[in-house]
């Protein structure tokens, strides 16, 4: 006979005293109760900023050593990792292999729940084995409960390989935190609907993943001022955004910005350096290469 999981001991599974009569509320009352709970999320995230910093530093070190940032999780947790990972290539022109989201059950589970797989530690390890995990990588295992076997298996395997390991959960002193080098335990309190961790827990985790990937991209030079200067110009909307970015940083006219972007092979950074230094595409690209992709350093290094 299997032992009970004792989920009632977890904060994420506790009943919320503020919403016990949500079933009696009218539509606006229901929404107010949910909104009141959601307002607690940002404050909870603020409490764990030092732990988030550690995760950013690990990912940055991995990138510097040719490694990757890998999110892994089951159910909603896995979907959050995939969502963050797939936005990095269009936003920052990084390779799809640099930030990876792995979900228990594979891509099919994103659209149709495959809940049973979360109980397999071996599946968590196997999915990392399949992408040839190395000691240069950073693995962030996401599990609101902090006890999901799939996440635990992933962390244990990653630790054995020598990768940086981080547990992201919503319960203090969680089981998977013991399997990781570092942990981010963002305690958002009981959910408006008991145990529905797709609500506050998922919101907190989405915020944290946004912060981690964004901060790392800033640190590797993908952002100048507060503009996404490495945006992948892959459609009309992004081309217009790229032109606007170039105009904002160089005071060029629309036509000049568009022409220079085209001359720069639609590489925004190169176009900016071309206009800032009055160089051609080849010279500007060389300056950027010598500056490891940082626009300000490329401009500083230029000597006419």
From Swiss-Prot:
Keywords, sorted A to Z: Carbohydrate metabolism, Lyase, Phosphoprotein
InterPro entries registered for this protein in UniProt: Etherase_MurQ (IPR005488), Glucokinase_regulatory_CS (IPR005486), MURQ/GCKR (IPR040190), SIS_dom (IPR001347), SIS_dom_sf (IPR046348)
Active site: 87 (proton donor), 118
The enzyme's E.C. designation: 4.2.1.126
Keyword hit for Phosphoprotein: yes
Catalytic activity: N-acetyl-D-muramate 6-phosphate + H2O = N-acetyl-D-glucosamine 6-phosphate + (R)-lactate
Annotated pathway: Amino-sugar metabolism; N-acetylmuramate degradation
Misc. comment: A lyase-type mechanism (elimination/hydration) is suggested for the cleavage of the lactyl ether bond of MurNAc 6-phosphate, with the formation of an alpha,beta-unsaturated aldehyde intermediate with (E)-stereochemistry, followed by the syn addition of water to give product.
UniProt family annotation: Belongs to the GCKR-like family. MurNAc-6-P etherase subfamily.
HAMAP family: MurQ
Assembly and binders: Homodimer.
Name assigned to this protein: N-acetylmuramic acid 6-phosphate etherase
Record organism: Bacillus subtilis (strain 168)
Taxonomic placement: Bacteria, Bacillati, Bacillota, Bacilli, Bacillales
GN (gene name): murQ
């Amino acid at each position: 006979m299997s032992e009970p999981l004792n989920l009632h001991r977890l904060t994420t599974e506790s009943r919320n005293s503020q919403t016990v009569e949500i079933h009696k509320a009218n539509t606006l009352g229901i929404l107010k109760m949910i909104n009141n709970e959601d307002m607690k999320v940002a404050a909870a995230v603020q409490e764990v900023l030092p732990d988030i910093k550690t995760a950013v530093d690990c990912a940055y070190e991995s990138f510097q050593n040719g490694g990757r940032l890998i999110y892994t999780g089951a159910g909603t947790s896995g979907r959050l990792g995939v969502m963050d990972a797939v936005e990095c290539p269009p936003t920052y022109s990084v390779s799809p292999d640099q930030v990876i989201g792995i979900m228990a059950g594979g891509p099919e589970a994103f659209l149709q729940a495959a809940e049973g797989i979360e109980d397999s530690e071996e599946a968590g390890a196997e999915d990392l084995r399949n992408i040839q995990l190395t000691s240069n990588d950073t693995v962030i295992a996401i599990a609101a409960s902090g006890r999901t076997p799939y996440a635990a298996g992933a962390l244990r395997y990653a630790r054995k390989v020598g990768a940086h390991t981080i547990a992201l959960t919503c319960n203090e002193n969680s089981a998977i935190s013991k399997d990781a080098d570092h942990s981010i335990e963002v305690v958002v309190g009981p959910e408006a609907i008991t145990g529905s961790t797709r609500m506050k827990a998922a919101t907190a985790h989405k915020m944290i993943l946004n912060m981690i990937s964004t901060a790392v991209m800033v640190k590797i030079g993908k952002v100048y001022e507060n503009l996404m200067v490495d945006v992948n110009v892959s459609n009309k909307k992004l081309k217009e955004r790229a032109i606007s970015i170039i105009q904002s940083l160089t005071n060029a006219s629309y036509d000049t910005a568009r022409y220079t972007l085209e001359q720069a092979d639609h590489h925004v950074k190169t176009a900016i350096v071309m206009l800032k230094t009055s160089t051609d595409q080849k010279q500007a690209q060389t300056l950027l290469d010598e500056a490891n992709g940082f626009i300000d350093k490329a401009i500083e290094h230029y000597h006419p």
